[in-house]
Amino acid sequence: MARYRRCRSQSRSRCCRPRRRCRRRRRQSCRARRRATRCCRRRYRLRCRRY
């Protein structure tokens, strides 16, 4: 959870905050979703949009 908040403060990009979508789409588990939070870093942004 700590990572999540940090990510939020760094940038408000969609990938950083949507916890709700994670429940809607069961393609990826919430866990995988949280990993995508790294997308705040520029490297992961593109990947993040996939989720």
Curated annotation (Swiss-Prot):
Phylogenetic classification of the source organism: Eukaryota, Metazoa, Chordata, Craniata, Vertebrata
Q: Does the keyword Nucleus apply?
A: yes
The GO cellular component terms are: nucleosome; nucleus
Statement: the UniProt record of this protein carries the keyword Nucleus: yes
What family does the database annotate?
Belongs to the protamine P1 family.
Record keywords: Chromosome, Developmental protein, Differentiation, DNA condensation, DNA-binding, Nucleosome core, Nucleus, Spermatogenesis
One GO MF term, please?
A: DNA binding
Role description: Protamines substitute for histones in the chromatin of sperm during the haploid phase of spermatogenesis. They compact sperm DNA into a highly condensed, stable and inactive complex.
Question: What is this protein's record name?
Answer: Sperm protamine P1
